C-alpha cells in the first residue's frame, strides 16, 4: 500500500479495519479478539500483521480511562547480514520500568514495534491504528487515546490526528519533528554538501550523482567521522558544519554520529522506500555568522570559500514522486482540533529544537494556537529526558483532557529541569 492511497482513503481504511477486526480476520498471529477480563490488570503481547505489540493495563477499577499509545522513534533497518533488526515492542518510552510506573498511576499503555524498521512512518500509521482498534476489542474503548510520539514517532502521531480525528484525542510529542520530514531531510543535504566540498564523501555513497539506497553508516563512514574528531583539520571542518547547521556546541558534540547517520544511512533507507531521492536544496541559502567566518579564516580555514561553494551547489532537485511520498506521509497541514503538547531538549543536534517552534507557528497561523503548548528541558542530546519530565508532560495532558485546562509554565517547574523561557535558534536554511 502506498501512503498516497492510504491518505486518500483513510476513512475507508479505518472502516475496513473495523470490519476485519469484528470478523476476527486480518490479525496476523493475534486473531483472538475476545474481550479480556482485566479485573486484576493485564499484560498482553503478540503480533498484528507482522507488527509486534505490547499492552499493559491496570486493574479495571483503577483505570483512569486514558490509553497512552507509545509511538517509537527511528530504528535502524539491518543493511548487512551481520545486523539484526530490533523488533521489541515497548508500551512506553524506556520500556518496562516506565510501563509499570504509568500503569501504577492508572494509565493503560500500548505500543507497536511496526511491521518494518527504518523510516517506517507509513507502517507506523497503519500499525498504530491496528493496535488501537485491537485494544478496544480486547479490553474496552478508552475515554481518550493519547499518542505519545518520540522523535520519528512524533511524525506518526502528528499525522495520525490529521488522518484519524475520531480515533485519537491528543498528542504528546517528545523531541518532535514538528517542522515536517521534508524540511529536516533537506537540512541533511546541507551537511552532505559541506562535508563533500571539504573532504569528499565515501565513493559508495554516490553523492551527488545518485545517492545509494543501501549505504551502511557503521561500516562505511563511522570510522572516518571518528578520525575527523581526532585531528585538527577534521575538527575545524566539523566546526564549520556545526555553524552552517545552526547547532549548539553541546548538541553537536553529543549527537555528531546520530547527525551523520541520519544524513547518510537513514537518507539512503528512505531513498530505497521512496524510489528516489526526496531531498532538494533549490531554495537554500547557506551561511555562517561573520564573526565565526573571520575566526575560522584566521586559523587558515577557507570558510568564506566553502560557503560560496555551497551556495553554488544549490542545484539538487528532488525526484518529484519521491518528494510527494515524503510530503504525503510526513509533512503536516495542522488541520485537526486535538490538543498537542510538545517537549524538546534545548541542545539537540539531531532534530533541531526549531522543529517545536515550527509546529507551534503552523497551528498559530491557522488560529489554532490554543491547541498547542511547548516546553523545553535544559539538557543535552536528542530525546534526553528524565522519567520525571516525561511524567510531567503526561500529567499536564491528563489535566488538559479532563478539565480543559491548557498547560502553563507552572506544570513544568525549573526544579525538574524545565526552561520555559527558552527560544531556540531558527532553522539555518
PLM regions with names:
Residues 31-63, 310-312:
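N-terminal cap/lid segment of alpha/beta-hydrolase-fold proteins
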Residues 350-355:
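Conserved alpha/beta-hydrolase "acid-adjacent" motif
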Residues 342-344:
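Short beta-strand/loop motif that positions the catalytic acidic residue
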Residues 144-198:
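Primarily recognizes the serine-hydrolase "nucleophile elbow" in alpha/beta-hydrolase
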Residues 62-63, 131-151, 167:
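Gly/Ser-rich "nucleophile elbow"/oxyanion-hole loop immediately N-terminal to the catalytic nucleophile
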